[in-house]
């Protein structure tokens, strides 16, 4: 992992690392930034799988959910995890404790439950953005 990207991911504006998985082929790190306006879930990958999928050595995906949509997010995550404390950090930690769960699975869960979110992904070769809902508020959370 490049030192600059590690610093951004781990220490960026109150980001709490919830899960870190390392294998011989891939490192996955999931973090959460909580602000009064909403939350930002960040997933950084690095390794052979990332190189195969994105043609880049590392990739970062971010999902932003506004404060008004947090109850729906917690509800949809708590459904399959009834024994987990109903807080976002606990639910996300439990979700990503499963080595088979990828960041795209979280996005699929949000889409299926119709929980609005903004998405941003970036790496050394490209940036992708998808905004839904209050674009100004979503933009503020991404700053």
Model-predicted regions and their roles:
Residues 1-4:
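Short, Lys/Arg-enriched N-terminal segments with co-localized hydrophobic residues
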Residues 37-75:
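Intrinsically disordered, low-complexity regulatory segments enriched in Ser/Thr/Pro
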Residues 7-8:
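N-terminal low-complexity, Pro/Thr/Ser-rich intrinsically disordered segments
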Residues 21-28, 61, 79-82:
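Intrinsically disordered, low-complexity coil segments
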Residues 64-143:
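Low-complexity intrinsically disordered segments
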Residues 11-40:
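Amphipathic, interaction-prone secondary-structure segments
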């Amino acid at each position: 992992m490049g030192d600059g990207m590690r610093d951004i991911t781990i220490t960026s504006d109150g980001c709490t690392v919830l899960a870190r998985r390392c294998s011989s082929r891939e490192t996955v790190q999931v973090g959460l930034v909580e602000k009064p306006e909403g939350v930002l879930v960040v997933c950084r990958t690095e390794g052979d799988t990332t190189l195969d999928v994105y043609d880049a050595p590392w990739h970062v995906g971010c999902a932003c959910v506004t404060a008004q949509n947090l109850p729906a997010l917690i509800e949809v995550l708590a459904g399959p995890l009834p024994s987990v404390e109903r807080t976002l950090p606990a639910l996300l930690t439990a979700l990503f404790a499963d080595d088979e769960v990828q960041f795209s699975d979280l996005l699929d869960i949000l889409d299926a439950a119709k929980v609005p979110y903004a998405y941003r992904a970036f790496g050394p070769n490209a940036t992708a953005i998808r905004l839904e809902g209050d674009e100004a508020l979503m933009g503020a959370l991404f700053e």
